[in-house]
A protein has these predicted regions:
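Conserved P-loop NTPase catalytic core
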Residues: 1-85, 164-167, 172-174, 178-184
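Hydrophobic anchor residue at the start of the ABC signature
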Residues: 95
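A short, proline-enriched helix->beta-strand linker immediately N-terminal to the Walker B motif
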Residues: 98-106, 110
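Helical segment within the ABC ATPase nucleotide-binding domain
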Residues: 120-133
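H-loop/switch region of ABC-family ATPase nucleotide-binding domains
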Residues: 141-142
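A short, surface-exposed alpha-helical micro-motif characterized by mixed small hydrophobic
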Residues: 147-149
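Conserved short hydrophobic beta-strand within the ABC ATPase nucleotide-binding domain
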Residues: 153-156
Length: 193
């Protein structure tokens, strides 16, 4: 791996996609259209920009492809203002944008927070599909059922340290809870975060 904690944001983003915990504060610009949100980190690409001017037709075409592919439902299609969309469709738009960037590392923080069962199932399928393509998916979640069902390996943090590394097939929610509360630790001790 490469140490990136002191790298510029643009350099970090070259190799990772990020699905943020708070879709309103960090995932979308709520007063932008859906199509504008779909190219937030890509608008400088020659596909979407020429001589400092945005290629609106290319952006709209790209947004329409993602809307269709990820079943993002919005009243006015790509020109829908993000604020007017349901939480599930806002989250699907973020998932579409981030997964389409095709980066080797995906960091998903609370990706299903506040969503309905249908949207949760859809997002889970997308994350598993990315893992199956060989990408690294770092899932950060407080939903223990989600962690248990999606993870190949679980690292438990307590007080800024990794206190447990568990196989979801060999553990249960009760044991996970003991690690999370600090009542149980792996013998080797934890690595500081």
């Amino acid at each position: 791996g490469e140490e990136i904690s002191h790298s510029a944001i643009r350099k970090r983003l070259k190799h990772l996609s990020h699905i943020p915990e708070d879709r309103h504060k960090h995932g979308l610009v709520l007063d932008f259209t859906l199509e504008q949100n779909m190219v937030l980190q890509r608008f400088r690409e020659t596909r979407f920009e020429k001589a400092g001017f945005l290629k609106k037709d290319a952006i709209r075409e790209y947004a329409n492809v993602l809307i269709e592919q990820y079943d993002v439902r919005s009243g006015q299609g790509p020109v829908t203002i993000a604020r007017s969309m349901s939480g599930g469709n806002q989250q699907k738009a973020i998932i579409a944008r981030e997964l389409d960037r095709d980066k080797p590392l995906i960091i998903a923080v609370q990706p299903t927070r506040g969503l309905d069962v249908g949207a949760i199932e859809y997002i889970h399928k997308q994350l598993v599909a990315e893992r199956d393509k060989g990408k690294a998916v770092l899932l950060v979640s407080l939903e223990l059922d989600e962690v248990m069902s999606l993870s190949d390996r679980i690292l438990v943090l307590y007080d800024g340290q990794i206190v447990g590394q568990l196989d979801p097939k060999q553990t249960n929610i009760q044991e996970l809870g003991l690690y999370m509360s600090g009542a149980k630790r792996d013998e080797e001790g934890g690595d500081a975060i």
